[in-house]
Amino acid sequence: MSTPKGKNDQALIAIVDDDQSFREALGNLLRLIGFRTAIFASARNFLDSPQFPNVSCAILDVSMPRMDGLELQRHLVATHPIPIIFITDLRDAKTREQAVGAGAISFLNKPVSEKTLIGALNSALSA
């Protein structure tokens, strides 16, 4: 199993995805490779969480009810800038351009390999 560069046990990674099985599997994987995680079923749950101010990086889905990932990204950029990685089923270029244009570190498609994910996290945490 790969490990993150300069394994950072202090980094808190937020996973915001309405797909319960995906967010739990991703949370388990990240904990196995040395990250602390906090998982949320919605953007609102994330923003209302007491853990929110301590998050080092957010992994977001694009398609979520009520507030989607792009809306959450805009909110974070305006109020609490942290590195953002999108992991999504969406494969359209316009959405990718919007996310990256607004500052996302990476825009990855599900399923994502562990190696690709670790590379994105290393980039995000060194940004």
Where do the model's predicted regions map?
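Non-catalytic signal-transmission and effector/linker regions of two-component phosphorelay proteins
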Residues: M1-A14, Q20-F22, G27, K115-A127
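A Lys-centered signature of the CheY-like receiver
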Residues: K110
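Conserved Asp/Asn-Gly motif in the active-site loop of CheY-like receiver
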Residues: F40-R44
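Active-site beta3 strand of CheY-like receiver
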Residues: P53-I59
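Receiver (REC) domain active-site loop signature in two-component systems and cognate sites
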Residues: M64
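Active-site residues of response regulator receiver
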Residues: D61, T88
